[in-house]
């Protein structure tokens, strides 16, 4: 069954169909902490919006949200307003991680990780990039995917792509209702907002 059966944008459908049709590629993304939902699971999200309140509590997001994958913690990778890619965590955190699905796939397949919230500075990024590419076991299938889609492979340029996503505005927020707190930055609850602001400031300078 094709992801055309869902209400996901055409470009997202193209990638999900490609990944889902190749077990090795799907497994590779799973090990990158991007576990792609099957078509029926995505349709369930479309038909039953209770998933949002079950996960986030009563709240009002400032984007239209369409889940397409999850990570090992139960957090969701989502399409925002049919364009940007965001993340909703299980502890009240959320944010934009890429300006579009092309850049999301580029970052994940070359970084070989979905732990984007841990990349709040350039030094951390290069360290994780080197470690992941050294240890990753399914690099062959991802290398083919990267080449086929003409993705950027230079770490400094990939970091730039990541920064463009995480500093994209308006920021993805969920406004809490009925006594629930608002969402907070992907960089953490206590000093996460300060980290995000520093990340933006460093990028803009």
Predicted regions and their residues:
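A surface-exposed partner-binding patch
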Residues: 1-83, 87, 122-123, 136-205
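Compact, glycine/acidic-enriched structural inserts
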Residues: 86-126
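Hydrophobic alpha-helical interaction segments
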Residues: 125-135
């Amino acid at each position: 069954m094709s992801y055309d059966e869902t209400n996901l944008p055409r470009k997202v459908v193209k990638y999900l169909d490609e990944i889902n049709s190749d077990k090795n590629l799907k497994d590779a993304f799973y090990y990158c902490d991007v576990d792609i939902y099957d078509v029926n699971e995505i349709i369930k999200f479309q038909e039953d919006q209770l998933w949002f309140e079950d996960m986030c509590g009563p709240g009002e997001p400032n984007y239209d949200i369409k889940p397409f994958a999850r990570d090992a913690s139960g957090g969701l990778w989502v399409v925002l307003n049919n364009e940007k890619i965001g993340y909703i965590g299980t502890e009240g955190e959320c944010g934009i991680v890429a300006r579009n699905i092309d850049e999301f796939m580029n970052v994940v397949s070359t970084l070989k990780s979905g732990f984007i919230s841990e990349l709040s500075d350039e030094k951390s990024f290069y360290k994780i990039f080197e470690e992941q590419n050294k240890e990753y076991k399914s690099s062959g299938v991802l290398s083919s995917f990267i080449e086929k889609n003409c993705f950027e492979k230079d770490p400094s340029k990939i970091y730039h792509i990541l920064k463009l996503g995480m500093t994209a505005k308006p920021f993805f927020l969920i406004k809490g209702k009925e006594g629930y707190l608002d969402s907070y930055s992907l960089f953490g609850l206590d000093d996460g907002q300060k980290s995000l602001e520093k990340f933006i400031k460093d990028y803009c300078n």
